[in-house]
UniProtKB/Swiss-Prot annotation:
<keyword id="KW-0812">Transmembrane</keyword>
<dbReference type="GO" id="GO:0051301">
    <property type="term" value="P:cell division"/>
</dbReference>
<protein>
    <recommendedName>
        <fullName>Lipid II flippase MurJ</fullName>
    </recommendedName>
</protein>
<dbReference type="InterPro" id="IPR050833">
    <property type="entry name" value="Poly_Biosynth_Transport"/>
</dbReference>
<feature type="transmembrane region" description="Helical">
    <location>
        <begin position="49"/>
        <end position="69"/>
    </location>
</feature>
<comment type="similarity">
    <text>Belongs to the polysaccharide synthase family.</text>
</comment>
<feature type="transmembrane region" description="Helical">
    <location>
        <begin position="297"/>
        <end position="317"/>
    </location>
</feature>
<feature type="transmembrane region" description="Helical">
    <location>
        <begin position="21"/>
        <end position="41"/>
    </location>
</feature>
<keyword id="KW-1003">Cell membrane</keyword>
<dbReference type="Pfam" id="PF01943">
    <property type="entry name" value="Polysacc_synt"/>
</dbReference>
<dbReference type="GO" id="GO:0008360">
    <property type="term" value="P:regulation of cell shape"/>
</dbReference>
<dbReference type="GO" id="GO:0071555">
    <property type="term" value="P:cell wall organization"/>
</dbReference>
<comment type="function">
    <text>Involved in peptidoglycan biosynthesis. Transports lipid-linked peptidoglycan precursors from the inner to the outer leaflet of the cytoplasmic membrane. Not essential for growth.</text>
</comment>
<feature type="transmembrane region" description="Helical">
    <location>
        <begin position="191"/>
        <end position="211"/>
    </location>
</feature>
<keyword id="KW-0131">Cell cycle</keyword>
<keyword id="KW-0961">Cell wall biogenesis/degradation</keyword>
<keyword id="KW-0573">Peptidoglycan synthesis</keyword>
Length: 544
């Protein structure tokens, strides 16, 4: 890849990661103010919105990026500009349709989410209010997403990265300010506070749009300067243009829906299953912990690992297109190994430190520290599946087998749908986690088979090195538990968030150092990270 594209990819990855970190950090003060009940109410609205947003955008932002990049490379800037205008019109229409459907269907979704009746102080009307407040964001976010895709198609990653961060900052400032003022100053009540917390999605979107508008004005000259240099135009009709665009968009739609769909299934089945099993008293709080508070923690290593590993995908596409299958196998190996090298120790660490970690972030008694720690313990290993599914789908797209990525998702979602309710009745939150894990495992097995079949990929080296990673992670785990045991003589993480933070930081630092040192001494670090590793560390023995 060119240095410009590499730099742009880094900027975009950094922006995305900063946004996700901010999206996790704000939950600390938010959870203190609204507790588990408020978290559940927030998720009832937000999970509906997330699914409708994915449907409304239809994968267009990523598809427009690919479309614009293709026609720009041919010098056909006129077709790129034509797509921007047409795409914005489509996003406006689909956003409005999604808004009206969600707004008008809110009573139905509210009843389903609550399990058919009022639940622990929350009524159907409360959930309807929150869903309708967040639905307003559907009028703006699709258009903003498409403009980001247009900039990315011109290899201008800065506008997307900066607008993502600003959108998140504006959203969080409004969310926390509104929640605090309504609860502490105006005594407006939990429902109104959470409603305005979800409404922050619209305010944040306006912030992101302002940034994009500033960038547009700043770069309008260079974009318009391309027009006189345009080559032969494709003269595509709108029908052909959108047909091509949909062919790009379809995989992004389905793959992007993976986590939202699994969350959506939990949101709409968990309470009903728990009530039928006789666990209504805890169902709502458990759902908030499962789908909001714990999941944010689980997604930290997922974000880092996938962002690091997916930078190799463009080179995979290039190798496949040129027919260089030997290089293709090496690149798939490096992508998979990079992700597993980062995600396995992170998951082991979070699992072993689930108690201190949950207490550090959500120390309030209203958020059930013991219950949260147990859910985090069992949920964190699923992060490995999340990461592998993302890269699995990306590789299938890279070798031009998008349809198999879609099929793998459908297989997993069907398994989740079938198993979720019976497993929740049997095992409560752990059952929902198990259903998610089984769904992702099925998707991954299918995806791995398709990659082997169509890319000629051998898993021999990957399996061998994964076993070594597990051994290194086990050694790291022993070090973490020893540190935690020693610290236990001086402080208890159960005494408060500060004590929990001390345990997490010291144990994680020691564990990480042990893992990296062992990997370095075995030459494992050098094998996997290669040139990404600073020169000082590129010595040592070589792992097999």
């Amino acid at each position: 890849m060119s240095s410009k594209l590499l730099r742009g990819t880094f900027v975009l990855t950094l922006g995305t990661y900063i946004s996700r970190i901010l999206g996790m950090v704000y939950l600390i003060p938010f959870s203190i103010m609204v507790g588990a009940t408020g978290g559940a109410l927030f998720q009832y609205g937000y999970n509906q919105y997330t699914l409708f947003l994915n449907i409304a955008t239809m994968g267009f932002p990523a598809a427009v990026s690919k479309f614009v990049s293709k026609y720009n490379s041919k010098g056909d800037y006129e077709t790129s500009r034509k797509m921007l205008k047409a795409g914005m019109s489509v996003m406006l229409v689909t956003g409005m349709i999604a808004f009206f459907i969600l707004y008008l269907s809110a009573p139905m979704f509210a009843e389903i989410s609550l399990g058919g009746k009022d639940n622990n102080g929350l009524t159907i009307d409360h959930v309807v209010y929150v869903i309708r407040m967040v639905s307003l964001a559907l009028l703006v976010v699709p258009i903003m997403s498409l403009v980001r895709g247009f900039f990315q198609g011109h290899q201008m990653m800065g506008p997307t990265a900066v607008s993502q961060v600003v959108e998140q900052i504006v959203r969080i400032i409004f969310l926390l300010s509104a929640t605090f003022l309504i609860l502490k100053v105006f005594n407006g009540g939990l429902v109104i506070a959470v409603g305005y917390a979800t409404f922050a999605a619209l305010i944040g979107a306006f912030g992101g749009l302002v940034v994009l508008y500033i960038y547009w004005n700043k770069r309008k000259g260079s974009l318009l300067a391309m027009m006189p240099n345009t080559g032969p135009t494709a003269n595509l009709s709108y029908k052909k243009m959108f047909f091509e665009l949909f062919s790009y968009a379809a995989p992004y739609v389905f793959v992007g829906l993976a986590i939202p769909l699994y969350n959506y299934i939990d949101t709409n089945t968990f309470n009903k299953a728990m009530i039928e099993a006789g666990h209504q008293a805890i169902s709502q709080d458990m759902l908030a912990i499962l789908t909001l508070y714990v999941q944010k923690l689980v997604m930290i290593p997922v974000s880092l690992a996938t962002a690091f590993g997916l930078t190799l995908i463009p080179t995979i596409t290039e190798s496949f297109t040129s027919g260089n299958y030997k290089l293709l196998n090496q690149q798939i190996n490096q992508t998979m190994q990079t992700i597993l090298f980062l995600i396995i120790p992170a998951v082991v660490g979070i699992s072993l430190l689930s108690g201190p970690t949950y207490t550090f972030f959500y120390g309030s008694e209203s958020l059930h520290p013991e219950l949260g720690a147990n859910i985090l313990l069992w949920y964190s290993p699923v992060a490995i599946l999340f990461s592998l599914f993302t890269v699995n789908a990306a590789i299938l797209q890279g070798i031009n087998k998008q349809k198999f990525a879609v099929v793998s998702l459908v297989i997993g979602v069907v398994i989740k749908l079938v198993l979720n309710v019976p497993l929740i009745k049997l095992m409560q939150a752990d059952g929902a986690i198990l259903a998610t894990a089984l769904g992702y495992i099925a998707s991954l097995l299918y995806g791995f088979i398709m990659i082997k079949r169509h890319a000629g990929y051998s898993y021999k080296i990957l399996v061998k090195r994964t076993v070594l990673m597990l051994v290194l992670s086990a050694i790291m785990g022993i070090a973490v538990k020893i540190v935690q045991w020693v610290l236990g003589f001086f402080i208890s993480y159960q005494d408060g968030q500060m004590q929990a933070a001390i345990v997490v930081v010291i144990a994680a630092a020691v564990g990480g150092a042990v893992y990296l040192y062992c990997g370095y001494r075995l030459g494992f670090l050098q094998k996997i990270l290669g040139r990404r590793l600073p020169g000082f560390f590129r010595k040592g023995r070589h792992a097999g």
